[in-house]
Each structure stands twice: as C-alpha cells, then as structure tokens.
C-alpha cells in the first residue's frame, strides 16, 4: 500500500471518500478513513512478513474489517501468536520483534512511559504516521497514532483466512478507479483472523471476569466496547447458532477456567462464582450505571449509528440467559 507516498492524491482521496453516501463517498469521517489506511497497511505488512503463518489478527477491529460485524473503530492492532508454548523464549522474542519491525515499517515509534512494553511474550507499542487530515481527535481516536499489541499468552484458535480491504480501497473500487488501486498496491489481501465465535466467547468471558471484580463498575466501564461488539455478534446468524450449541457452553467453561488460572487481575474476581456476577444477578441496575459511559464513548468510535442502550441490554440479557 503506497498511496500515502503521493501526499496530494492521498489527501484528496481521503476527503472524497469521507463525503456523504449521496455525494459518492462512504459517509465515514476523514480521521477514520486515514487511520484505517494505516491499520490496513500494517496488517498487510504483517501478512507478508509472517511466512510461517503464526500471527493471527483478533479483537474488535477484526470484527468490522474481516467480518463486517459492527461499525466501530479502534486505534489498536491486536495480534496473537499461534503455538507460542512450543517455541523457545529466544525464538518467540525474535518472532515478536520481527513482526513489530515489519508492521511499523516507515513509522516513528512514540515511547510512552508506563504504557509502552517490550517483553519477550508481549509487546505494546505506539507509532506515529504522517497526518493528512486536520481533525486531531474524535472521541478516543487520535489522528496520527497507532497502537500495536502482540501477545503470546493468548491461544488464537480457531482462526480463518479473511479478505481485508481498506476504506480507501472500497471507495476506489466503487468509484471505478481500479487503475489507482493497481498503481499504488491497494488491492484487498488475505489475513489469518480469529474466528468470530471465539471472539464472542472471549469478550463474554472478559465481561464476566470484570463483573466479578471488587470495583466491577470501573472494570466494566473500561470494557464498554465489548457490550457493543456482543450486540452485533448476537445479530450474526452463525454466532446465534453457535450460542445455541453445546460447543459454546463447553468453550465458555474452558475459557473461564483458563482465565482463572492466568489472570489475577482485576482484584477479587478469582474467588467468586459465576452466579455472583452483577451482570447476571442485576443486569438492569448494572447496565443503568454503565449507560452514561456507553453514550459518551461509543458515538465517537462508531462510523454508523450506535444501538440504543435498550437494544444493548436486551442483547446482553439474551446471551447471559444462555450461560
């Protein structure tokens, strides 16, 4: 992906793509279109560098980009390593370092004390890209900055191969500009992505874990995006069928048990039973306490209208009724 090398054309394409749908654009804010370009570029560089197929894209960004589930944005690129437990410490550290270097090619690192982490099993790094839009920030989304997380503690299985295309590629396709796609290497590409059903289970277990914490409202507020994602995952036909299956219940129990062994944080959660969760015992009051956070944070992350708080509560109630 090299469209950014032609700065004037890049800026013009972003502005054209950000126009309303009736005006031939995508109806998505310019800051989202620009950041999406750089996220997709990093993912494409990862796909090229990951010759052994050990890196898997996961998290909320993967839902919208790979599966078209939901319409929210995230500044982070979440990557998990397959079969990390079968690698030596040095091999794993080398692999993570290699992926980080390739995915951030041409970008400047931003070292943030207390946030940047470069361990042998986990990396969290911030990078700056050259801005082409004037908008500096919308909600939690900052222009000019990417967050890359590479994690060897997760088990990203099952996964599948998905086609990824940037918003700009989508716009160029719709507007009949295939020649620009070819000239600037803007073609869609394939990538290993965590199965959406596994993502559903992980997000649900994460919410349960946070709800069992001593300071559960604070912990759940930090995961408000999970409520949004679960609403749209429930709306997906394959995920709905999965929720009805014995496979889901088995996967949920296994992952919850796994997390109890792996995560000591947040404080207090490991000693409590599932039935102690305020999401299960008193969803109405718990969600009412979280609604302000949802209404404040999610509109700035979504590029389409967000579900109402009532719709989110109904979806979460449906899912919790299954477990």
Regions found by a protein language model. Give the residues of each.
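Betabetaalpha-Me/HNH-type nuclease active-site subdomain
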Residues: 64
